[in-house]
Amino acid sequence: MKKPEKITSRTANFAKWYVDVITQADLMNYGPIKGTIYFKPLGYKIWENIVKIVNAYFVKQKIENVYFPLLIPQDFIEKEKKHIEGFAPELLTITKVGGKNLVENIYIRPTSELLFADYFKAEIAKNNILPIKLNQWSQVLRWEKTTNPFLRNTEFLWQEGHTIHASKVEADQFAKKIARFYKYFLENYLAIPVISGQKTEREKFAGAVNTYTVEAMMQNFRALQSATAHFLGQNFAKNFEIFYKNKENKSQIPFQTSWGLSTRLIGAIVMVHSDDNGLIFPPKIAPIQVDILEFFSKKNQEVKIFAKKIAKILKNAKISYKIDDTDQQIGYKINNSEVHGAPIRIEIGPNEVKNNQICLVRRDNHQKFFFNIDLLKEKCRKILEQIQADLFKKAKIRLLENTVFVNSINEFEQAIKNNKFVIAPFSESPEREQEIQEKTGATARCILPKNSFFALPQTGNSIFSGEKTNKFVLFAKSY
C-alpha cells in the first residue's frame, strides 16, 4: 500500500492544498476531459448522504422526484433567448451525429427550466391542478472556462427543484422557504455557517425575478455560493404559453420557482473544515464516523476480537465505522486515518485489550480520551455531537472575525485587499458592480435582509454616490 504523500500547507498554497487533500483522501480522480472527475467511493458516499438528508425534507414538503431528458431541442432555446444568454458561453451543442449534420441543433441541458416549463404546460392542460412541486436528482453539463474539482466542473451532480403556483406571493414565499432550508441544512448538517440574502440585479439567475442565495466563507476567505432558490415569476410561463383556469374559469398565467444545490458542497466541506493533515468531516455528513485501528493484531488475535466487540457496539448505536486490520505500521495507519477525515479514531493494541479500555482520538483537535469499553456508546455519541458543534463554532468565528462594515470606497478597496467579506451601503447600478469587480476582483454576493445576524444601521450613504440608502450588500472575492 502506497504511503500517503505530504500535503501542501494551506498557507503555502491554498489551491494546491485543496487538490492534495481531495486526491490523497480518495474523493476523486481527474477525468479524461477537462472539468470532469471520477467520483471515488468515499467522495460519492458524501453525495449519497447529502441526497438522503435533503430528499427526506422534500418528502415532508410533498415534493415529488422525477427525471427529465438530458437533451433540449432548438425551438425551446429560441423561446427563452434571455435565459439562455446567461449560459451561452457554457452551452454544449450537438450539431452532428455519426458524421451527418443535424437539421436543427440539439443542446445538452445546463439547467432544466425549459423542460419543466414544457412539462408543466402539458400537466396543467390535462389536470388544471396547482401547485405542482417536483425535483430531479441529475447531472448537468456546462463548458466552464476555468474548472476546479467539485467547485466548478464541466459535468456535475445536483438536485434541481421546480414548482408552479397560481399565486405570485405563494411562489415567491416557496422560493424563500427553500432558501431557508438550504441555510438550515448547511449549518446543521455540514457545520458551515452561511450568510443568506437576495442577489443583486446583476448577479441574479438569468430569467429570474428574484434569486435567494446562501454564501459561505472558505478558509482562504473566498465566498462560495452554496445553494440558490429563484422566484421566476411568469417569465417562462409566458414564453411557453402556460395557462390554468381559476375559480371563475378564467385563463391565468401561473408563477414558477426553481432551486438547487450541487456537488460543490463537497468542495465546501473540504475548504471550510479540513487541515494540513487532510480531511475533517462533520459527523452528521461523514461517510465513516469512526475509524477502528488495530495495532499488532496479526500477532495478537485478542486485538481482533476486541475490535469486533467495538464494531458491534457502534453498529447497534447506528454509528458508522471502518476497521483497519491491515499489517501496516502504526504511524501509517494513524496518518491514513487523518487524511481520510473520520471524526473519531479508536486505537486498539494489547494494552487496550488487557485493560478493557478504549483509546479515542478526535480528528479535529487530536484530543485523546481513555475510558472503559462499557462507556463507548455514550461517550462516542457525546463526542461526535461536540465535534459537530465545535466545527460550526470555529467556522462561525472565522466568518464573523473576517467580515467588516465599510462606509467609503477607500475602506472598501482596502478591506477587499485584506481578503475580507465586506458589507457596504450600496444602491448603485450593475455597471458600478462591474467596475468594482474589474478593480478589486470582488463581486456582490447578496443584499442582506433586515433580520441579518449582522447589526446593520437603518440607513447609510452609498459608497459611490453618497446617496442615502437602506440597502446593504455583501461583497467578496469568490469561487
Curated annotation (Swiss-Prot):
Gene Ontology biological process terms, A to Z: prolyl-tRNA aminoacylation
Subcellular location: Cytoplasm
This enzyme's EC code(s): 6.1.1.15
Cellular component GO terms held in the UniProt record: aminoacyl-tRNA synthetase multienzyme complex; cytoplasm
Annotated signal peptide: none
Keywords from the UniProt entry: Aminoacyl-tRNA synthetase, ATP-binding, Cytoplasm, Ligase, Nucleotide-binding, Protein biosynthesis
EC top class named in words: ligase
SUPFAM superfamilies associated with the record: C-terminal domain of ProRS, Class II aaRS ABD-related, Class II aaRS and biotin synthetases
GO MF term (any one): proline-tRNA ligase activity
Primary location: cytoplasm
Domain commentary: Consists of three domains: the N-terminal catalytic domain, the anticodon-binding domain and the C-terminal extension.
Quaternary structure note: Homodimer.
PANTHER family: BIFUNCTIONAL GLUTAMATE_PROLINE--TRNA LIGASE, PROLYL-TRNA SYNTHETASE
Described function: Catalyzes the attachment of proline to tRNA(Pro) in a two-step reaction: proline is first activated by ATP to form Pro-AMP and then transferred to the acceptor end of tRNA(Pro).
Family: Belongs to the class-II aminoacyl-tRNA synthetase family. ProS type 3 subfamily.
Protein name as it appears in the record: Proline--tRNA ligase
Source organism of this protein record: Mesomycoplasma hyopneumoniae (strain J / ATCC 25934 / NCTC 10110) (Mycoplasma hyopneumoniae)
